[in-house]
Amino acid sequence: MAVPVVETNNILSHPEGGCPLQVGEGTYELKDDLHLATPPPHPSEAPIINPNPLATVPTPPTSGVKVSLVCVSPRSRTPSFISKQIVTAPPFGDGNPALVPAPVKDGLKRRKPKNNIIKSSSSFVSRVITHEVATKRLSERSPEGLFAFANINRAFQWLDLSSKQKEDPLAKILFTKAHMLCHDINEVTKSPSHIDVVMGSSAGDIIWYEPISQKYARINKNGVVCNSPVTHIKWIPGSENLFMASHANGQLVVYDKEKEDALFTPEIQDQSAEAVKASSTQPLQVLKSVNSRNQKTNPVALWKLANQRISHFAFSPDQRHLAVVLEDGSLRVMDYLKEDYYGGLICVCWSPDGKYIVTGGQDDLVTIWSFPERKIVARCQGHNSWVSAVAFDPWQCDERTYRFGSVGDDCRLLLWDFSVGMLHRPKVHQTSARQRTSMVAGSSQYGNRHRADSVGNRMRSDSQRTANTYESCDQAVRHPVEPRARTALLPPIMSKVVGTDPICWLGFQEDCIMTSSLEGHIRTWDRPREGINDKYNDQSSSTAVSASAAGSGSISGLAESTMGSL
């Protein structure tokens, strides 16, 4: 049987009149569709022939195409209402002298990784393809242009989205076997001459990459700290050196990009059998504290949350709280500065002012949770399959109204608006709420993409349990499940099928909306021009009045969750 030819070049198209997004303030027009090329397998990889869908052998972890965006000299303004309300917390590890970074000889010069990735002899990196005139393109481009970093299969691409030839990557890294599953850019250290990128792989290794100099360093090499795939990775807010990675074995690890690795041994002060057993039952096991004086090597801190995959996490705008999503359908919120835990919900994104958490997951629902009130205020029904990403649009938010979007395996992009006034408690219906069944969009061949992998861990909402008051237990507060009839239902203001493959990522920029999909399509919609609909605020307020019948309720439709004090 002939091996199919795999296209190795990206393709840029400009669909005419295709897939407009119509909302109150105007129409978002699809500007372009950048289709990333899927690289062929490395010659050393054994081809998978006729895989058995019923096989119990674990498949290699994948994540679809994720995109990290950066503008080294931002032209965009930060929405004013955000800066008014956010009070930043002290730096992570503040007070531990062992974490004070060593002084730099040239204070204006950023430290770079030591190894040249183009000339690398490492078996981890297969090869690097750079654009023949990359230096010229970098020197001639505007510093206000947008860079994008994207993963697809075993490739990692650096793209200039402000270029007319945006389909031609400035650099493409091909790894031998590992797939990059997640990546992030340091907003503190970025400049026209320096960009710090960290990326986590399916092998557990982490790459610190500086694309302008094409230097790199390998962290957690061969899983010396944690030998489990990296599921999500983010720079710690405000830090030049520290970043956090979640692993598929339920561990959260804080690394320093400039420290060497060492074989990790848990630092448990009381090694008695009773103490170890008691520690294993805690919702957050601190295997190494950020306050440890042993900070010569990685990890800086290591926490065990569960014996299952951590899917995602997000830092709150006040830089104190961390929302962590687990594969069993729960979300835990912790004060990561104090290494303390509380929480229990579904899937994660913070509002720009830190007042709300929006969640989405395997029950096909999006949920709005009030963080100050510790309760659910609305459920958002509109997806037909698992919700893969949620994000707020800060340019459409103000002190009272909020805009966010969600994407999922049903190939849909949904936009939602809600205001404080519309989130009131509805009347309790006499009839019991029927438990909703998740449906897969028949038009998508990918609807069951994740279900075979984690069907045993999938947790359904128990919508017929009655609401009770909080009850304390071992310094925790347990939130019983509330009937769905008591919870507000919020409809989307826009729902659109985008393409034919699952959508993996969603991002908002000042001038556009962007998505990426499983097969490598990066789509960009231009925002409506100013003045198209000056009456949008009036219309949205009337919409809020009509939608307010949905109301709100306390935590509902969720598995029993646990909350402790900060």
UniProtKB/Swiss-Prot annotation:
Pfam families: WD40. GO terms for biological process: carbon catabolite repression of transcription. The keyword Protein biosynthesis does not apply. Gene3D superfamilies: YVTN repeat-like/Quinoprotein amine dehydrogenase. SUPFAM superfamilies: WD40 repeat-like (SSF50978). GO terms for cellular component: cell division site; cell tip; nucleus. WD repeats lie at residues 225-265, 305-340, 341-379, 382-426, 498-535. Residues 433-447 have a biased composition (Polar residues). Residues 540-566 have a biased composition (Low complexity). Interacts with creB. PANTHER family: AT02583P (PTHR14107:SF16), WD REPEAT PROTEIN (PTHR14107). Component of the regulatory network controlling carbon source utilization through ubiquitination and deubiquitination involving creA, creB, creC, creD and acrB. Required to prevent the proteolysis of the CreB deubiquitinating enzyme in the absence of carbon catabolite repression. CreB deubiquitinating enzyme stabilized in a complex with the CreC leads to the expression of genes such as those in the proline and quinate pathways. This is Probable catabolite repression protein creC.
